Amino acid sequence: MIIRSPEPEVKILVDRDPVKTSFEEWARPGHFSRTIAKGPDTTTWIWNLHADAHDFDSHTNDLEEISRKVFSAHFGQLSIIFLWLSGMYFHGARFSNYEAWLSDPTHIGPSAQVVWPIVGQEILNGDVGGGFRGIQITSGFFQIWRASGITSELQLYCTAIGALVFAALMLFAGWFHYHKAAPKLAWFQDVESMLNHHLAGLLGLGSLSWAGHQVHVSLPINQFLNAGVDPKEIPLPHEFILNRDLLAQLYPSFAEGATPFFTLNWSKYAEFLTFRGGLDPVTGGLWLTDIAHHHLAIAILFLIAGHMYKTNWGIGHDLKDILEAHKGPFTGEGHKGLYEILTTSWHAQLALNLAMLGSLTIVVAHHMYSMPPYPYLATDYGTQLSLFTHHMWIGGFLIVGAAAHAAIFMVRDYDPTTRYNDLLDRVLRHRDAIISHLNWVCIFLGFHSFGLYIHNDTMSALGRPQDMFSDTAIQLQPIFAQWIQNTHALAPSATAPGATAGTSLTWGGGDLVAVGGKVALLPIPLGTADFLVHHIHAFTIHVTVLILLKGVLFARSSRLIPDKANLGFRFPCDGPGRGGTCQVSAWDHVFLGLFWMYNAISVVIFHFSWKMQSDVWGSISDQGVVTHITGGNFAQSSITINGWLRDFLWAQSSQVIQSYGSSLSAYGLFFLGAHFVWAFSLMFLFSGRGYWQELIESIVWAHNKLKVAPATQPRALSIIQGRAVGVTHYLLGGIATTWAFFLARIISVG
């Protein structure tokens, strides 16, 4: 008798042709909503169209349909990203001085944009060195291209075309997986399989293939470039991949192939998989051999992580079990029910992912300057400042987005009847304690951090420098930060005996790396000035968290409005006849949180910009004397509010204000224009709906008089629309002003 194991049941995970492709449908504005599809009666229609076009929850209640729309939209997003990348590479191929920069990256500035003199604006094409005139770019693409082994503009062309092909492929995939073969809900909820593919596939194999590229292509090409070989003489990437002898000339252990791997004699590979620490003195970037080693290690970790969860084979972790086992003696039911929340609410899922990605983006901002990963990045001060600022802003927006979607989850997806005594329920039940304590912390930090500055301004104004908090009078040294710095500076000799230097030169230890007479990085001293501004950071971050967390915890109900959940995510007030209930919706908390996020990030990027110009960036003489851009004035000037205004904002804005008539004049115009956009926002934030409705009605009267009245009735913006337009212009104007101020300054002095 033959006993067979039962045949595995094949689950059909897609529906065929669920939604027909219809261009007529797409051409009808608002086809996703009965009300909007009727067309406009009033001008509010266009606002509703924009507000609801991507709010898939408002189109349908069917979770499967919502999931498919989100999934399909992701392919569209990827298509746009590939298109953008293709454009970047195309500019590098067609309009840039990449090959010239590659031959002399210390004296030639990167440029990939040449202004066409259509209206006589050719003055913007500044001399970036090497006889090339164009706009200096600060995105870091040149440094990435060099690190990845791109040596010619032809290679950039090919990559640009490849990215276009991928963009088309993604567009097709988005259409295919919604209209032709749409996944079933069960597929979206199969978290273990998803973890398997995302961890082992995307992150594991992705890192492994990148490590392979770095070892076989980037390392040899960069070795030649560092030695001063003409890029045209360097073998092409495929020659290194196909011809092992070429690599063996640079790294002799390559001649032995995979033998050392299988005989566990891994130290043979230490030539190109290193653990040195510190920066390469030739390029001022991390050792590329360290980076290759890192990606190999990360790949192994993620390949293992991706195989820990139970998929088709009945072994491994079950995520639901892990979450339900996760409870301590004081946490009631713990994470019971969290699995159901995260598999049925995309908003809950998104909130967690945005919070983590936002935090990670801010971590990236801090590592890009302290451990500059690409060759010649550290000495390109404009790019360093831009990368820090960019990643800080993005991180701030993502974290506010996390709070927004957490609140939407609370309003739309949270079911209080099934949740009892789990962690979320317990947090909600003592939300008053959380918010009131957080409020106390904010008041304490605000008064004390600001108070230290006010004290210093007062003493300075009264001519009593000996009574100020400063490194030369009453010291407030950041002793914990200094302790962390020293621990890390001493680490290589203690915890990592194989490493020749610490993870970052910023920790201390006296090393300085300079490339082409410019400082790449050196130990960053921390003193009283940093202690003061650090507490301003603590204050602004805590206030942002207070506003956002209050919005989430009180999204469904509060003492003021017990039935808030019925009013939805955004509403202006709790109806007529209930005074004092405006600006309480979860949306309004996001709105207010954005302003404090803007405050918080502004102080961070100002601190960074001035600190680096004062204590890190500068030139080094043949005798080894470092001259910093602002001559080390941060420690004594930034300890008063007046100092920030006088020696940072005013002194450093001279470049942007005096840029007219030079190649930086576009930044001068942007500086002016962005101030205007910012001021324009105040018109929306400080005036009410009724004011505008009155004005509109008298304008409509005039149109009627002349018989030119439109069929669509004009309406004033609703309260929420006005605030949305206001905060958008406030942030756009503020960020663009900062951008123009930073870049004009750093391009002229850096």
Swiss-Prot record:
Protein's cellular compartments: Plastid, Chloroplast thylakoid membrane
Membrane topology recorded in Swiss-Prot or TrEMBL: Multi-pass membrane protein
Membrane spanning residue stretches: 70-93, 156-179, 195-219, 291-309, 346-369, 385-411, 433-455, 531-549, 589-610, 664-686, 724-744
Biological process according to GO: photosynthesis
Positions bound to phylloquinone: W692
Pfam families reported for this sequence: PsaA_PsaB
A GO term from the CC aspect: chloroplast thylakoid membrane
Known catalytic reactions: reduced [plastocyanin] + hnu + oxidized [2Fe-2S]-[ferredoxin] = oxidized [plastocyanin] + reduced [2Fe-2S]-[ferredoxin]
Protein origin, superkingdom: Eukaryota
GO MF annotation, one: chlorophyll binding
This enzyme's EC code(s): 1.97.1.12
UniProt KW keywords: 4Fe-4S, Chlorophyll, Chloroplast, Chromophore, Electron transport, Iron, Iron-sulfur, Magnesium, Membrane, Metal-binding, Oxidoreductase, Photosynthesis, Photosystem I, Plastid, Thylakoid, Transmembrane, Transmembrane helix, Transport
Binding residues annotated for [4Fe-4S] cluster, in chain numbering: C573, C582
Enzyme class: oxidoreductase
Binding site for chlorophyll a': H675
Textual note on the cofactor: P700 is a chlorophyll a/chlorophyll a' dimer, A0 is one or more chlorophyll a, A1 is one or both phylloquinones and FX is a shared 4Fe-4S iron-sulfur center.
Keyword field contains Membrane: yes
Binding annotation for chlorophyll a: M683, Y691
PANTHER family reported for this sequence: OUTER MEMBRANE PROTEIN, OMPA-RELATED, PHOTOSYSTEM I P700 CHLOROPHYLL A APOPROTEIN A1-RELATED
Stated family: Belongs to the PsaA/PsaB family.
Function: PsaA and PsaB bind P700, the primary electron donor of photosystem I (PSI), as well as the electron acceptors A0, A1 and FX. PSI is a plastocyanin-ferredoxin oxidoreductase, converting photonic excitation into a charge separation, which transfers an electron from the donor P700 chlorophyll pair to the spectroscopically characterized acceptors A0, A1, FX, FA and FB in turn. Oxidized P700 is reduced on the lumenal side of the thylakoid membrane by plastocyanin.
Subunit structure: The PsaA/B heterodimer binds the P700 chlorophyll special pair and subsequent electron acceptors. PSI consists of a core antenna complex that captures photons, and an electron transfer chain that converts photonic excitation into a charge separation. The eukaryotic PSI reaction center is composed of at least 11 subunits.
Name under which the protein is recorded: Photosystem I P700 chlorophyll a apoprotein A1
Source organism per UniProt: Nymphaea alba
Gene: psaA
